[in-house]
Amino acid sequence: MKHFFYSAFFLVTMLSISSCAMDEGMKPVNLSVDNVVSKFGDSIFLSSQVPCIDAKNGSVYITDYRAGVYALDSKLNLISKMSNIGRGFGEVNRPAKFFVDDNNVITLYNEGLQRYSYFEKDSFLMADNASVKENLAKSCRFFTRDGAIYQSVLGGKFLVSVIKNGNVTKQMCPTVDGVDFPSNVALSERHLLEGDNCFYVIGLGLPIVQAYSFDGRELARFNLVNIPLLESVYAKNENLKSSNSYYEVVRDAYYKNGFIYLLTSSFEGKYKCNTIIVLKKNADNIQYVSAYTLKNNLYSTFCINDQNECLAVCSKNSSIEVYKLPKVK
């Protein structure tokens, strides 16, 4: 069964893309940097360990493993530091992924404390006292809706748990036959993105993007192997001997104005993580739109702001790079 998904999809894929493998429209466009920011004010420098960035309602938010949680304005000037490392009010320990809702409330997963914390634009709100006992996919995007957290989980029959007050109230999105391997739990990690009237479930190591309704119905599915520049990347995961490891192809994911953006890796020669894939859901399917290559080789996270700019965190240079994206339809 391990090879069924890849073998079947590779056969179908080779037939379906053989005529377009050299299509110029499938090749990534090289982007130029418009701005670079590596420090805030006179004394706060960004570290190389930034797991998440988001832009919402004119502000930008970042988590830094070394320093905590920051709120910035649209020009990337510091508004406030919203957390403390160590004991005390607003404590965080290895702040990881987070989600900002329409009311500027930030739900942050405290990886070291194994619980969620909540922040407003410029202050700490409260910490969830209940540790989450689920086996969470800690490196994945999640979202909140109606007071509940939608989070990817590992090792069960379902890919998504809905969590309130530390308790699982609902499980959704069954594992996919022929795609998920019970012997490789790590491969079941998924990014979750809230869309318009649906949400997206995106594999980190498996080439699958799914759209679901909020009542758990699958609406559409896309196989990332259909994108020629990712075909050989996913082939490496098929050949892994370890039963609990994988190559992380989709490092980060983001949803903005009807488009799904994926930060993807490649392993040909020197490791790189600098290509943005753009997808769009139409009535009943998900389609490839375009791809962009960022200037440097290694990026940990990114987001898209209201000005259609990509804010990408460069791990090597410990900086936020700003790119103006071409308009897509």
Q: How should these model regions be labeled?
A:
Residues 47-52, 92-98, 135-145, 187-191, ...:
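Repeated scaffold domains used in trafficking and secretory/extracellular systems
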Residues 62-66, 107-112, 151-156, 201-204, ...:
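Conserved beta-strand positions in repeat-built beta-propeller and related beta-rich domains
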Residues 70, 114-117, 156-161, 206-210, ...:
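Structural motif
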Residues 241-279:
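Loop/turn-rich, solvent-exposed surfaces of beta-rich toroidal or solenoidal domains
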